[in-house]
Amino acid sequence: MSELVEKILSGRFTRTALLTMRENAIARLKKNPKDERALEVKEVIDTTQVPKLMKEYVFMGFMPGADIDRAIDDKWYSEGVCTFDFYEDSNQTEDFYRILPGDIVITKKMLIASGEMEIYAFGYVTECVDSPNSNKRWLKVDWKHPKEFMRVPLMGCTRTVNPKSLEMVEEKMPPEFWDWLR
């Protein structure tokens, strides 16, 4: 195990540094798919939980086109995954690729008229997977299902992928939200 990998595993790097290292490893693998060091760095970052204070809360829409008949949350829950297929939006794609193991994904539906959203389930990202077949990323998620959904402030979560820092979530969410996450 290299010194770099040991530092990654010990939590010595910031979230930004981890994402930069991951991007660099991917760039090296494009040039040389057998680069063992790049493979090892990418694998460790894709499977190692970020430190608690670096976690992000990702409020994730699950109804393509806001159409309830196209909802995919049940598939996510049963398969232990989270996917994203709106690659035409480069900002959301970038946000989806910033998700790391240890982050919390929360399924949500916007209620624009009230300035709220309904949240249904949450899960801890356990691994990030870049599919060589589809050239798309998906997440392995350990989903939890609270007994009831909850209405919370919208917090600007108007897109499919809405990452929020711990500080923002602490500032905006009611105390009941933290009970719901248990």
Annotate each PLM feature.
Residues 2-6, 31, 37-99, 171, ...:
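Compositionally biased, charged N-terminal/linker segments
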Residues 9-19, 26-39:
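Charged, low-complexity interaction regions
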Residues 18, 25, 45, 105, ...:
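Hydrophobic beta-strand residues in large extracellular and virion-surface proteins
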Residues 31, 51, 108-111, 125-128:
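Amphipathic alpha-helical interaction surfaces
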Residues 55-56, 101-104, 120:
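Short, surface-exposed beta-edge/turn micro-motifs
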Residues 65, 113, 131:
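Surface-exposed, flexible loop/turn segments at secondary-structure boundaries
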Residues 94-112:
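Short coil-to-beta transition motif at edge beta-strands of beta-rich domains
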Residues 116-182:
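Aromatic- and Lys/Arg-enriched surface recognition patch
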